[in-house]
Regions:
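Conserved NTP-donor binding/palm subdomain of two-metal-ion nucleotidyltransferases/polymerases, i.e.
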Residues: 1-48, 53-176, 253-369
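Intrinsic disorder/low-complexity segments
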Residues: 124, 173-256
């Protein structure tokens, strides 16, 4: 069932991307099926809807979508889209946002600065076709803002944390493979996409694959050799000690430079402490080695965020602390109550949340059909 759902969603993501391309829009699939490629078995991830970033800005994209379906609702970062073959689609003109106006301004400038690379980063989605997905550096920042948004609004889901674990793993795989494209340094360094027929067996290590078969054409091989084991070629080509040492040195230098860039952006965006909280969870819950953490773990903040995950769940659906009911008024009161709880840890976002919500009300009136 899970396998079939992923195959179906893959097809839909490819078709929706191609449909927008024919209409003159470049696109990039956010999260979702792009994240599935990072899993040991891409068909094992529980699929959701399709989040597609469409180039063009809010006015142009909203106008285009409403020329097809006039009554679709728009919010600051996306507009609803008619379901495509039964699949829910959200069309983004902004990948994500932050509630603090100052930090959000910087985030939107960052997205504008790096968008060209995202729209041109093509990968194979299994054997079904090509889509554009974000680069690994972009994902480290974008998906952290997405998780933060869930924390500030209603609640973080476990799948978002699992996704981020594999985002970090994918980051190091990409830089490891780019440092030594001819030799993959560890058995776990190869991301592959098994055929749907093989994924149901549970054996996700059986297929023979070379390193990084799913990377973009520009960033590495997109096809695999059926005769390549992909992780242990020492017997075939002799002693690789010197080459391995050189590759490790190059990998460390490249990944360190990339981490420095990511850390700089996280500080600029006011996400440093939240990143530390997520790294604490990655280490304590998911067992990620300290050498793979992108910032130093923050135990105090990590325990707080982990408690929020366990108490609330995705969108706060399981939060027993919701004492105001499910009405619109109750929802707004619950948001204020949540802001009070969060202000001690994330004051800029929590204090700006009521202001942003008020501003967003008028923004939606402006774009209301």
């Amino acid at each position: 069932m899970l396998e079939k759902a992923n195959v179906r969603l893959n097809d839909t993501a490819i078709q929706v991307s191609e449909w927008f391309r024919k209409k003159g829009f470049r696109t990039c699939i956010l999260k979702g099926q792009g994240n599935a490629l990072m899993y040991p078995n891409p068909y094992s991830r529980t699929p959701g809807d399709i989040d597609i970033w469409v180039e063009g800005g809010d006015k142009r994209v909203i106008s285009f979508v409403r020329s097809i379906s006039p009554h679709e609702k728009a919010c600051y970062h996306h507009i609803e889209f008619p379901s495509y073959k039964g699949m829910e689609v959200e069309v983004h003109y902004r990948p994500s946002f932050l509630l603090c106006f100052w930090h959000n301004r910087k985030l939107q400038k960052y997205y504008e600065r790096v968008k060209e690379e995202q729209f041109s980063h093509q990968v194979m989605l299994g054997e079904q076709g090509e889509i554009a997905i974000p680069t690994v550096e972009f994902n480290l920042i974008f998906q952290l803002t997405h998780i933060f948004s869930h924390l500030m609004n209603e609640g973080i889901g476990l799948r978002q944390l699992v996704d981020y674990y594999f985002v970090i793993c994918d980051f190091y795989k990409v830089y490891q493979n780019s440092s030594n494209p001819s030799v993959s340094l560890s058995k776990g360094s190869s991301t592959f996409s098994p055929s749907p027929s093989s994924s149901g067996s549970g054996d996700v290590t059986a297929p023979s694959r070379c390193s990084e078969p799913l990377r973009s054409k520009d960033g590495g091989p997109s096809k695999v050799s059926p005769n390549c084991a992909g992780w242990d070629r020492r017997d075939a080509i002799g002693d690789m000690t010197s080459a391995t040492a050189t590759a490790l040195s190059s990998f460390a230098a490249n990944s360190s430079a990339a981490i420095d860039r990511v850390q700089k952006e996280l500080k600029e965006l006011g996400l440093w402490k939240f990143a530390g909280a997520i790294m604490y969870i990655m280490q304590e819950v998911f067992g990620m080695p300290a050498s793979r953490l992108i910032v130093h773990p923050n135990e105090k903040y990590g325990k707080f965020v982990l408690n929020e995950v366990l108490e609330a769940g995705n969108f706060g659906r399981h939060d027993a602390r919701n004492r105001f009911g499910r009405s619109q008024l109750g929802h707004n009161l619950q948001r204020v109550y949540r802001d009070i709880r969060l202000v001690r840890y994330f004051p800029a976002e929590a204090l700006c949340e009521p202001l942003f919500r008020t501003w967003h009300f008028f923004w939606r009136l402006k774009y209301k059909k």
